């Protein structure tokens, strides 16, 4: 299935739904150079856990995931 990932640019990924959020972060890192530990992946504004698969998160075909950077400081 196709999945859209919006980071600094919009990317189209071909996925099965069995990929983990951590794998998506690694892919975004290779595309945009943002370290996975500095990424927050959001679905409808809610952050997704790294260990969860896309299917477990409710990601369906043609869904858009947002990738935000972590805020520095505390």
Curated annotation (Swiss-Prot):
User: What InterPro entries does the database record attribute to this sequence?
Assistant: FUBI, Ubiquitin-like_dom, Ubiquitin-like_domsf, Ubiquitin_CS, Ubiquitin_dom
Q: Which family does it belong to?
A: Belongs to the ubiquitin family.
Can you name the source organism? Pongo abelii (Sumatran orangutan)
- CDD domains tied to this protein: Ubl_FUBI
Gene name of this polypeptide: FAU
- Note, other: This protein is synthesized with ribosomal S30 as its C-terminal extension.
| Superkingdom, natural source | Eukaryota
Task: Please give the name of this protein.
Answer: Ubiquitin-like protein FUBI
